[in-house]
């Protein structure tokens, strides 16, 4: 697992729902990424819909995958 120093935190919007609790997110900088829910969001049964604004964490080593850590209201 990556250290906290190696993660990049960005915001974006859910563009598409993919199978297996994966999502296509369009970041604020215009870059699309594939993301999955973090464990606490899965345990809390938090669901995402198209158009939701989210905060994602990305590894500095793979900028195509991300983890959704927060859904904005």
From Swiss-Prot:
Task: List each copy of the S1-like domain by range.
Answer: 1-73
The superkingdom listed in its UniProt entry is Bacteria
Q: Which residues form the signal peptide?
A: none
Q: Name one GO cellular component term.
A: cytosol
Q: List the disulfide bonds.
A: none
Q: Which PROSITE patterns match?
A: S1_IF1_TYPE
Entry keyword set: Cytoplasm, Initiation factor, Protein biosynthesis, RNA-binding, rRNA-binding
MF terms per GO, please?
A: ribosome binding; rRNA binding; translation initiation factor activity
Which subcellular locations apply to this protein? Cytoplasm
Q: Which CDD domains match?
A: S1_IF1 (cd04451)
* Family recorded in the similarity comment: Belongs to the IF-1 family.
What role does this protein play?
A: One of the essential components for the initiation of protein synthesis. Stabilizes the binding of IF-2 and IF-3 on the 30S subunit to which N-formylmethionyl-tRNA(fMet) subsequently binds. Helps modulate mRNA selection, yielding the 30S pre-initiation complex (PIC). Upon addition of the 50S ribosomal subunit IF-1, IF-2 and IF-3 are released leaving the mature 70S translation initiation complex.
**How is the quaternary structure described?**
Component of the 30S ribosomal translation pre-initiation complex which assembles on the 30S ribosome in the order IF-2 and IF-3, IF-1 and N-formylmethionyl-tRNA(fMet); mRNA recruitment can occur at any time during PIC assembly.
Q: Which NCBIfam families match?
A: infA (TIGR00008)
What is this protein's name? Answer: Translation initiation factor IF-1
């Amino acid at each position: 697992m990556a250290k906290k120093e190696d993660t990049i935190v960005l915001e974006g919007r859910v563009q598409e729902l993919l199978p297996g609790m994966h999502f296509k997110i369009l970041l604020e900088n215009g870059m699309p990424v594939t993301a999955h829910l973090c464990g606490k969001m899965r345990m809390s049964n938090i669901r995402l819909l198209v158009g939701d604004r989210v905060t994602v964490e990305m590894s500095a080593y793979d900028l195509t995958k991300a983890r959704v850590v927060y859904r904005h209201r």
